[in-house]
């Protein structure tokens, strides 16, 4: 991104590497998506479409942009893997750390609360490429989930925070039979509620490490 000297804005802009600006960019995007989330909730409560329209304008831009993203690469393995879709390490789909992939949390909530309006008002680009909002949203949400399931930490704080990122997009998916790969909300929720994986403990194993004293 281009950085501006606040003390002297007339100075030429300076290109700032993502590794030095990433959290700031993500923070700005979280702030914007939170506005969409809040507006969608107000629409759900009141039925006033002006709030749904506001949320949809934000969500649709995020959705289309994210649809064309690939997971970040880390050829030097500073995060524990080469990135992309390779299991292991801590990289998220969007952020350097999976536990900071919180854009999807706010996007999923906006999607859920303004769902009916979003479906009726797809982004123009989706119509141009012959896709609908529901299909693209599911694909994008599942990317965040699938990356989260093979990244982060198996136990402790990392594990719980990783599930926190993944839970909301899981809940807005349809049932298993809606998807060609058979992976809908039931499939993913089973991994949280019942079945631990090599990368994340499920709730029964989380409780085994819970210290009732401290």
Name each model feature, range by range.
Residues 25-214:
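Aromatic-lined, polymer-binding surfaces characteristic
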Residues 19-21:
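Acidic/polar surface patches and capping/hinge elements
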Residues 1-17:
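Low-complexity, Ser/Thr/Pro/Gly-enriched N-terminal "stalk/linker" regions
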């Amino acid at each position: 991104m281009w950085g501006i000297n606040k003390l002297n804005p007339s100075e030429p802009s300076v290109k700032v590497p993502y590794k030095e600006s990433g959290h700031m960019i993500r923070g700005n995007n979280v702030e914007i998506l939170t506005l969409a989330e809040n507006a969608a909730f107000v629409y759900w409560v009141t039925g006033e479409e002006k709030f749904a329209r506001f949320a949809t304008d934000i969500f649709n831009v995020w959705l289309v942009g994210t649809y064309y993203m690939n997971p970040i690469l880390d050829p030097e393995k500073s995060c524990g893997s080469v990135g992309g879709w390779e299991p292991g390490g801590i990289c998220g789909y969007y952020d350097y750390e999976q536990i900071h992939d919180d854009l999807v949390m706010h996007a999923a909530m906006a999607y859920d609360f303004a769902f009916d309006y979003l479906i009726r008002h797809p982004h123009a680009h989706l119509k141009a490429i012959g896709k609908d909002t529901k299909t693209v949203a599911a694909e994008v949400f599942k990317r965040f989930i699938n990356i989260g399931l093979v990244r982060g930490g198996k136990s402790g704080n990392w594990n719980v925070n990783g599930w926190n990122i993944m839970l909301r997009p899981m809940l807005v998916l349809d049932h298993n039979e809606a998807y060609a790969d058979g992976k809908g909300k039931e499939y993913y929720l089973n991994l949280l509620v019942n079945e631990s994986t090599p990368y994340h403990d499920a709730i029964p194993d989380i409780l085994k490490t819970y210290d009732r004293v401290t």
